Amino acid sequence: MTPADLSQLIKQTAIDVLSARELDTTVLPETVVVERPRNPEHGDYATNVALQIAKKVGMNPRELGQVLADSLAANTAIDEASIAGPGFINIRLAAAAQGEIVAKILEAGATFGHSDLYQGRRVNLEFVSANPTGPIHLGGTRWAAVGDSLGRVLEASGAQVTREYYFNDHGRQIDRFTNSLVASAKGEPTPEDGYGGDYIKEIADAVVAQHPDVLALAEADLNERFRATGVEMMFAHIKESLHEFGTDFDVYFHENSLFESGAVDKAIQTLKDNGNLYFNEGAWWLKSSEYGDDKDRVVIKSDGDAAYIAGDIAYVADKFDRGHDLCIYMLGADHHGYISRLRAAAAAMGYEPSNVEVLIGQMVNLVRDGKAVRMSKRAGTVITLDDLVEAIGIDGARYSMIRSSVDSSLDIDLQLWEQQSSDNPVYYVQYGHARLCSIARKAADLGITAIDPDLSLLTHDREGDLIRTLGEFPAVVKAAAELREPHRIARFAEDLAGTFHRFYDSCQILPKVGESAEPIHTARLALANATRQVLANALRLVGVSAPERM
């Protein structure tokens, strides 16, 4: 019996109790909250449903709680139900009912933890979207890991997810990038507002190698050749780095296409037609303050050029017009103002603003020996995705980025993540999976299988702890999807690995040399197999490998 199953049982029991007394059953919450008590001596689970509804039905909380506890205790799945404090109900499951969790995991396999929470939803998930003017930096690396993991979690929750990279190839930053390449090719100093680093020289040299006569072209043609070829080469490197990192995209959307296709002009005309654009002081303004923004925004400047928000307006419209009903933007710490701005843009275009979500990620720093690591040899100024992978590997880089909430700034201690010890979180979790695989191999060598185990034998405290932890996984995935917080999966994996290691230290899973296999060994092997499955499922959701040997 999973916590979700127990929640349903408690609710149905409450409905029966209230109905028998001709009391209002509509006061019950949609989902009865079931939690594990801090003190395991109090039981396996606890609920406060009696406290929630007692006053609404005119009963004393303890009196109602006792009636509910007595009714629950009559169920064969419940070993004990008792009242504590002002009306909490503590519940201890029967061993057979608790063991059902193991059977459910083994039956569901790789889909355990999945749900239909967002079945039928089409989600556009835009993340990374770094300018094609340099390698992916640490902020982009965080989004590459977290965004990919969030996509996996949403898909596990039934959503159809489009992973999208917005390719900023329209604007002043491309001019600066081009000027930097040209200066490098000519052997001139980097422009004052240009980009430095070895990668600029590498790309400039590659452009010259591909087009030997490029430096003899007229200035306009020379700049265009370096712009087009340089951006193409830089973006190819970005794609390659992301692919090796385990992050791929379904759509690479070019900002420039919004202008070339007429999408920006079309969006502006729509806003004029629906009255959400007005002319003032030589410019066209969006009535964004009417839709929750802190002020109106200039869309067409007095010189006739489109402001940056013009592309944002056309882009959000394009996302909805492609059939997405939820658009999630994952942006850097300097984009807080975009939350109200993008929602206002959607509303002004006639779309539901609540279907636009903006997640803001905080800064990432690398630390070694207690000091910040700031320089990248290749990039010149910032640490890159490639630098991090080279230092701690792909799994370490992904996991280090995912395991903390993006709401908080992140310091990555390179010494910690380089260790092959239990102090390293990803090593700790992966070692748990590898140890479980080793157990499965040894069981196979001994001819022991987990077919038709008697799971009611799993009564040891460590067995119960492990089973209850496994049972939490579906709720963890659900919360990670609803709250857009994939770090919950990583933290759960660490908790599960720790609970397993404690079980392993306390319970003999396989018979000792010279002993015959007993039913308890079969039951514990089934529990170990279920744990291996859930650890693998969790690691898959964060995009980290589940090694069979370490």
Swiss-Prot record:
Broad class of enzyme this protein falls into: ligase
Q: 'HIGH' region: where is this motif?
A: 130-140
The record's listing under Gene3D superfamilies reads: Arginyl tRNA synthetase N-terminal domain, HUPs, Isoleucyl-tRNA Synthetase, Domain 1
The record's section on Pfam families has: Arg_tRNA_synt_N, DALR_1, tRNA-synt_1d
Keyword field contains Transmembrane helix: no
Q: What is its EC number?
A: 6.1.1.19
Gene Ontology molecular function, alphabetical: arginine-tRNA ligase activity; ATP binding
Q: Where is the signal peptide?
A: none
Q: CDD domains per the record? A: Anticodon_Ia_Arg, ArgRS_core
Which cell locations does it reside in? Answer: Cytoplasm
The UniProt entry's sequence similarity note says: Belongs to the class-I aminoacyl-tRNA synthetase family.
What does the subunit section of this Swiss-Prot or TrEMBL entry state?
A: Monomer.
Name used for this protein in its record = Arginine--tRNA ligase
Please name the gene that encodes this protein.
argS
